[in-house]
Amino acid sequence: MDNLFEIDETKRLRREEAAARLRDLADVLARNNEVEFERDGGRITVHVPDEVNLKIEVELGGDEQELEIELTW
């Protein structure tokens, strides 16, 4: 059986703060093939290949709108 590690975090931020976090992540991805995440005193390093699949999903309707950005490989 494969071990699954997952971080699922939801925070309410100002739009500018969310953009800054996305920008920081984009900068790290542009410079390195690794991204580090910290959670509950632990740290995980994700190795990202040179080519990835980018999925952008928009859901409109109802009370909640959604823009989802996903990288897979």
Residue positions per predicted region:
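Long, charged, low-complexity intrinsically disordered regions
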Residues: M1-E6, P49
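Predominantly single-stranded RNA-binding modules in RNA-associated proteins
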Residues: E6-D8, D63
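Short, structured protein-protein interaction patches enriched in aromatics and acidic/basic residues
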Residues: E9, N33-K55
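C-terminal edge-of-domain segments
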Residues: N53-W73
